[in-house]
Amino acid sequence: AVQRQGLALVTRRELEVLRLVTAGATNREIAQELVLAETTVKTHVSSLMSKLQARDRVALVLLGQKVLLQ
């Protein structure tokens, strides 16, 4: 339920980042794919972790798998 509330706050760009994180891409690879600075990707990942209450990147990937399969 908490993740669902957080998901409502996720931006379109953060959703793109989540898709790539879930696919196993590194921050550098995500930055290249989305034409962003690596620090911007780190900011998006941190924001996603906060919004979705993921304690680490692995938890974020697991949440991403659930969210993206719906």
Describe the residue ranges of each PLM region.
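Regulatory hinge/linker segments at domain boundaries
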Residues: 1-20
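Hydrophobic patch in the ABC ATPase nucleotide-binding domain
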Residues: 7-10, 54, 69
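A broad detector of short, well-ordered amphipathic alpha-helices
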Residues: 15, 59-62
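Short, locally clustered residues in the helix-turn-helix/winged-helix DNA-binding domain
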Residues: 19-23, 65
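Recognition helix of helix-turn-helix DNA-binding domains
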Residues: 24-59
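Intrinsically disordered, low-complexity basic tails/linkers immediately adjacent to helix-turn-helix/homeobox/MYB/SANT
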Residues: 63-70
